[in-house]
A protein has these predicted regions:
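N-terminal glycine-/serine-/threonine-rich beta1-alpha1-beta2 phosphate-ribose binding loop
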Residues: 1-94, 120
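Short loop/edge segments at beta-strand edges and connector loops
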Residues: 61, 100, 108, 127, ...
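Short glycine/proline- and charge-enriched loop/turn segments
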Residues: 15, 95, 168-176, 265-270
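C-terminal helix-rich "cap/oligomerization" subdomain common to oxidoreductases
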Residues: 14, 74-76, 219, 289-329
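Beta-strand-loop-alpha-helix segment that lines the small-molecule cofactor/substrate pocket
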Residues: 73-74, 80-132
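Active-site loop of classical SDR/Rossmann-like NAD(P)-dependent oxidoreductases
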Residues: 4, 274-285, 300
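Predominantly a Rossmann-like dinucleotide-binding segment in NAD(P)-dependent oxidoreductases
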Residues: 131-205, 322
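Contiguous beta-strand/loop segments that form the cofactor/metal-binding neighborhood of enzyme cores
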Residues: 183, 189-258, 284-295, 328
Length: 329
């Protein structure tokens, strides 16, 4: 994920945004050479050749050295989940703004600690909820808000991929990663929250590696369902889809299609033209706008990450109990 953020910052600079990558920190010396180590389940736009020039970008095996640099204003935390809160807090105490990868943490208490530190230091700390910025998904939020096709009456989200083979065993240790429930499915839980607010209850079936949840959302008369999972076959292609029914249209997104977003109305089916950028570009450009004063509040605030964490924990409780579980307010 670090290389994905790096490439997005570089594209932002190339497009004229007031930013420049000045430093990289990693405990692995091989990653400080600037050479690519490709991994992941989606094309993030990161290049497969040299990622950065170490003669132009400072490199630090010790993150505290990076945080002590006056040249650094914004830090992307792209590490294992268990380190997110500690590193984000250290960055804010050093006077830096923070973009922290998802999931922010696996507990409500950890997210609350981070919120308090952001309030105390006055620093920006934004969770990297990239789907809020993803072309076709930001469009969906706009249509929901404007009611251009009426209100949403049902929604189904699907996010499936091969089980991660990278990460040195981190992802297969569900006590550390939270499994696909926390690490992959979080995207759709966040988007359900983004569209409908906090669900009152959830009913989850499956396993921590592959699950399906029905969300009780008071504003939606029909079902709101999200399926997410890491599948056993390494050759399985990544799948990211939604079908959302409005009163006067159906929106159908499938990242695997040449035309990912289609809208079906009473009289026609049409393609919706989307931006060539991706959600990583969007979240990073928004973070830059926040730091430079061109935006005044995060589109993905930490308070939302707290609510999403509560929803995911309710899903885990439902999974264990075998019946619907209310979401703590």
């Amino acid at each position: 994920m670090g290389r994905t953020h790096l490439a997005a910052y570089q594209r932002a600079e190339a497009d004229g945004l007031p930013c420049r990558v000045v430093a990289v920190s990693d405990r692995d010396p091989a990653r400080l050479t600037g050479k690519a180590d490709p991994s992941g389940n989606i094309n993030s736009g990161a290049r497969d050749e040299q990622l950065f020039d170490p003669s132009q970008v400072a490199t630090f095996p010790d993150v505290d050295e990076l945080l002590s640099s006056d040249a650094v204003q914004l830090v992307s935390v792209c590490t294992h989940t268990e380190t997110h809160v500690d590193l984000a807090m250290r960055a804010m105490r050093a006077g830096k703004h923070v973009l922290v990868e998802k999931p922010v943490a696996l507990t409500v208490e950890a997210v609350e600690t981070l919120i308090r530190e952001a309030d105390r230091t006055g620093r920006i700390c934004m969770p990297a909820m990239c789907m809020r910025f993803w072309p076709g998904w930001s469009w969906l939020k706009e249509q929901s808000a404007s009611a251009a096709y009426g209100r949403i009456v049902s929604a189904r989200f699907e996010r499936l991929g091969a089980a991660p083979s990278w990460g040195g065993g981190f992802y297969s240790d569900f006590d550390r990663s939270g499994g696909a429930l926390f690490d992959l499915h979080v995207h759709d839980v966040d988007f359900v929250y983004h569209l409908f607010g906090q669900a009152s209850a959830v009913n989850t079936v499956g396993t921590l590696a592959h699950l399906t949840t029905t969300f009780a959302c008071d504003s939606v008369p029909g079902q709101v369902v999200a399926e997410g999972g890491w599948l056993t076959s390494p050759s399985f292609p990544f799948r990211m889809r939604y079908v959302v029914e409005f009163e006067r249209a159906v929106a159908d997104f499938d990242i695997a299609r040449d035309s990912p977003l289609m809208v079906h109305t009473e009289h026609e089916s049409r393609e919706v033209e989307l931006s060539g950028l991706n959600g990583y570009d969007g979240e990073i450009r928004h973070a830059i706008d926040l730091v430079t004063g061109r935006a005044d509040r995060p589109q993905a605030p930490l308070a939302d990450a707290l609510c999403v964490t509560r929803m995911i924990l309710a899903e885990r409780a439902s999974l264990e109990a075998g019946h619907p579980v209310p979401v703590d307010a």
